[in-house]
């Protein structure tokens, strides 16, 4: 089946290139493959406002490096985060980071909560999102020091943009209980 049979061609453009970033490339090797790779061209299309989003099934590390080289970061945000929409019985959950960052500080996790809540609100403007930390358990005392510190900060912080719902051990029942970021 061809894409054009499923999606109206006015919504996409295919730009061919023979230069690829391999899944076995390190993030830096991928970025060094240059400005003619499909990933670089896709990110460049967002920078030039020819596209609003990039969807990639390619090398995740290279995607983050190429994006960081080409796109401006939001002021005071140190790390980018991948996001995904996960369906649940009550709707959708927005999940950030998705394992893209091996190590995060509590500041990074708080930044992710703000970015995730903002994304959720842009998709569902009539709902106030619930933010939860994915953790090894739902109890406040579980997790490493970074998770515990982040929990305390988010729990004490009054946000007009979202409700803090604590820690979440991700199960299908937990996801269905609330629409969460």
Map each language-model feature to its residues:
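Conserved small/polar residues in nucleotide/adenosyl-binding loops
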Residues: 170-178
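Short glycine/serine/threonine-rich phosphate/pyrophosphate-binding segments
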Residues: 36-39, 60-67
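N-terminal phosphate-binding or glycine-rich loops at protein starts, especially the Walker A/P-loop
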Residues: 1-3
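Glycine-rich phosphate/diphosphate-binding loop of Rossmann-like nucleotide-binding domains
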Residues: 106-166
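Phosphate/nucleotide-donor binding subsite
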Residues: 10-51
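Short, acidic/small-residue loops that bind anionic groups at enzyme active sites
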Residues: 66-98, 157-166
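Acidic/polar active-site rim loop that often engages polyanionic ligands
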Residues: 89-102, 128-136
């Amino acid at each position: 089946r061809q894409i054009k049979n499923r999606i109206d061609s006015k919504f996409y453009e295919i730009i061919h290139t023979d230069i690829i970033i391999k899944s076995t490339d390190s993030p830096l090797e991928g970025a060094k493959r240059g400005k003619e790779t499909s990933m670089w061209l896709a990110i460049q299309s967002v920078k030039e406002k020819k596209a609003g989003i990039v969807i990639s099934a390619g090398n995740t590390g290279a995607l983050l490096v190429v994006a960081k080289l080409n796109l401006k970061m939001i002021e005071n945000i140190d790390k980018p985060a991948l996001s995904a929409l996960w369906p649940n019985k009550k709707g959708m959950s927005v999940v950030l980071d998705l394992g893209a960052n091996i190590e995060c500080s509590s500041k990074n996790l708080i930044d992710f909560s703000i970015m995730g809540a903002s994304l959720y609100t842009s998709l569902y403007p009539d709902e106030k999102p619930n933010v939860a930390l994915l953790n090894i358990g739902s109890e406040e005392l579980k997790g490493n020091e970074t998770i515990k510190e982040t929990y305390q900060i988010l729990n004490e912080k009054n946000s007009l943009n979202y409700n803090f719902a604590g820690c979440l051990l991700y199960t299908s029942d937990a996801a269905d209980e609330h629409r969460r970021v």
